[in-house]
Amino acid sequence: MCIIGAGKYSNSNCLVKVRDRNYVPAIKIIRELVNGVEVAYLYDIDTDWSEGVNEYGIGVVSSALRVIDDEVVKKEKSRADDGIRIRKILAHDNVSCAVNEAVRNGMSGHCFISDPNQNITFEPQPEDGNHWIKFLDLKN
């Protein structure tokens, strides 16, 4: 199970994640332009999973709701759809557009999307096809 969090550290927004898998992932750190936006992200070579930050300070971390599905993706050497979705989220220059990208393309798990001023939690509701979005107040 993966655990994600959003909070403040030294008066700056920060995102954290513990990525716990039943396998040893093959990970690369990639820095590239995505639709003209500079991004740096963690990339799981076997599953295409990605999480990272862009030049505008927009960051994304995500936790799969159904870990068993992720384990199957690794075992079968197939690709998870959320990797490309997260890279598309990171290709935006403002957090509102990034959240709209997440809503438009969907995500399979709970994620935090953050910029220097805001932290947003986003979670799909598969039973009704809707999304739960909340702007977090982390001033204290």
Regions found by a protein language model. Give the residues of each.
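N-terminal nucleophile
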Residues: 1-140
